[in-house]
């Protein structure tokens, strides 16, 4: 029981109870996350993870490229919320096709992507629609490196977040 408790007081007590519980019941040698636990606003959770209960073990984060694509000449992304997911791995054409099939199965109209080649150039279905003078800006905004693939989700804000969240966990 707590009198005149603030939100911070409740969080602190809750974290103490949870930490003690986890330490008591965790398998021997298992690491327990120390308090304070991360606090993520709903808005930030939807932007970075695409859901309001993110699995923080998944290292992928969603990137907001809406403003960038409003200035770009790629018309299908104009007046839409654009989210992107960057992954670093050598992916086969089959992987792209599997992800595209998943995207259409959840209701997306398609899934654009770009791969960063060894020479720093891009390869992918929307490469020719992004002006050369904007490619370096996109590389900087998304933190792209050689070997990365970036997937694009463009839709209304709520649906873009939901789709990006589902792709992030696929």
PLM segments and residue spans:
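Class II aminoacyl-tRNA synthetase catalytic cores and aaRS-like
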Residues: 1-170
């Amino acid at each position: 029981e707590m009198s005149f408790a603030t939100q911070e007081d409740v969080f602190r007590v809750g974290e103490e109870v949870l930490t003690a519980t986890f330490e008591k019941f965790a398998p021997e040698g298992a690491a327990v996350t120390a308090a304070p636990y991360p606090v993520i606003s709903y808005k930030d959770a939807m932007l970075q993870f695409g859901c309001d209960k993110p699995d923080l073990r998944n290292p992928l984060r969603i990137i907001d490229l809406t403003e960038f694509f409003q200035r770009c000449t790629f018309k299908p992304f104009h007046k839409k919320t654009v989210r992107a997911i960057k992954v670093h791995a050598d992916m086969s054409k089959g992987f792209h096709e599997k992800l595209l099939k998943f995207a259409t199965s959840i209701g997306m109209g398609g899934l654009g992507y770009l791969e960063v080649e060894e020479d720093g150039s891009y390869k992918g279905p929307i490469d020719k629609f992004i002006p050369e003078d904007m490619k370096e800006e996109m590389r900087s905004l998304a933190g792209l490196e050689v070997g990365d693939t970036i997937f694009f989700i463009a839709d209304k804000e709520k649906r873009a977040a939901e789709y990006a969240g589902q792709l992030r966990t696929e």
